Amino acid sequence: MGFITKAIPIVLAALSTVNGAKILEAGPHAETIPNKYIVVMKREVSDEAFSAHTTWLSQNLNRRVMRRSGSSKAMAGMQDKYSLGGIFRAYSGEFDDAMIKDISSHDDVDYIEPDFVVRTSTNGTNLTRQDNVPSWGLARVSSKKAGGTTYYYDSSAGKGVTAYVIDTGIDINHEDFRGRAKWGKNFVDDMDEDCNGHGTHVAGTVGGTKYGLAKGVSLVAVKVLDCEGSGSNSGVIKGMEWAMREASGGGNGTAKAAGKAVMNMSLGGPRSQASNQAAKAISDAGIFMAVAAGNENMDAQHSSPASEPSVCTVAASTEDDGKADFSNYGQLVDVYAPGKDITSLKPGGSTDTLSGTSMASPHVCGLGAYLIGLGKQGGPGLCDTIKEMAHDAIQRPGEGTTSKLIYNGSGK
């Protein structure tokens, strides 16, 4: 069950400071990627200064290659650059210790963070009704009482809203999507398909015709995790950057365009300042983001992007309104949503039943799309709307944790 494979939550600590730039150290249980780092620039650094820095970096690396002895391994250097909303500029790549020391001494650098493995988070009026729902979560979202079998929803059903699913990809040809899913971008391998199944399951809960909350939403696959359900933090951030630009009209859009978009991240890893900063940039751009709280049965403050306050962090509930035993908790959890034994789509035209905060988060993403379709204001403030609509239902939610369970306002 999810976060489907566990990610070990840790807190990054400052390893050293050289001329003000922190080199962060991952905790002892993080699956760090050897010699891979994310370098984050100071917020005030301009595009021109960022370009000058990367030019300096390339020149420095070239000099090192020329001086390198035949026995030492050549590092790949900078591999990706990031710019989210003009407030988060960074790059990632492969660097040796000497190069990292040089980078850390550069005045424009804010901090350097080791790259690590990130994994899936799987352990009204005019109402339409869907009877005998295939997954209990649908009925629970539209009723203030547990045990129902009907999903009540407005026929607008999220039409005109686009949901970006940052995950393992989506089987866009699954019949339950009825042509509303499309491929976006792949940041992890050369297979534009969901070879894991996690992303298709998540997308089905967001917007499947039979299995989804927002049955009219458009879905976009942003693949950042591989067939095993894992990927690098740097690759995930690259996917976040792409989705943000697309949601904002290719980087030249308006807040209105962004307000018609939602994102889901049913994944996570150790607490990451870079990941949280990227998530905040997306929220600041006026885009609603639902994020899985994590499945370690501990405080969500230790996981990213769940620990970023500007996103909507979702814990998992059971069919009898309890806290799922695996679900993370804590003050950073915004709401609970159904997350145990959730049936949704599986690549190849079939279905699967999975558990995890990975399954809870898309209920909130789908609800967000549904509410925008009804005319509610999008963006990060939508999480406050969802919390206001939610009702106290969760028994023993965890220390310092809300007992609010999501509700779509059907009146049932």
From Swiss-Prot:
GO terms for cellular component: extracellular region. The gene is SUB6. It comes from the Eukaryota. Glycans are attached at N123, N126, N252, N264, N408. GO terms for molecular function: serine-type endopeptidase activity. It comes from Trichophyton equinum. This is Subtilisin-like protease 6. Residues 36-120 form the Inhibitor I9 domain. Keywords: Glycoprotein, Hydrolase, Protease, Secreted, Serine protease, Signal, Virulence, Zymogen.
